[in-house]
Design a protein with these regions (language model features):
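Compact, glycine-rich, soluble single-domain proteins
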Residues: 2-95
Length: 95
């Protein structure tokens, strides 16, 4: 699925992902490829993104985005936001 993470300051990430774990109002939830359409509010917490392929150039990432040793998992701390998934495209507006 295509993921776009946007903050008021910048576009933090845009790319193809396998799964995204999000801090929802009622706890953590995960969105996988081909998930049903959804709109949800987010609370303060950490977003975990499982990439479909390792990142080749991590130097261009915003400093809020952390990458694991395999370059296949991103984590981003957020203060809240909103997420919408339609047609296998996930748009995340984060604070």
């Amino acid at each position: 699925m295509q993921l776009e993470i946007i903050t008021p300051e910048s576009n933090l990430f845009s790319g193809e992902v396998v799964a995204v774990q999000l801090p929802g109002k009622d706890g953590l939830f995960q969105i996988l490829n081909n998930h049903a359409p959804i709109i949800s509010a987010l609370t303060k917490g950490t977003i975990k993104v499982d990439l479909s392929q390792p990142l080749k150039n991590t130097k261009k990432l915003n400093k809020r985005v952390q990458v694991d040793a395999s370059n296949k998992v991103l984590t981003i701390d957020v203060d809240g936001g909103v997420v919408e998934l339609t047609n296998n495209k996930l748009i995340l507006l984060a604070e």
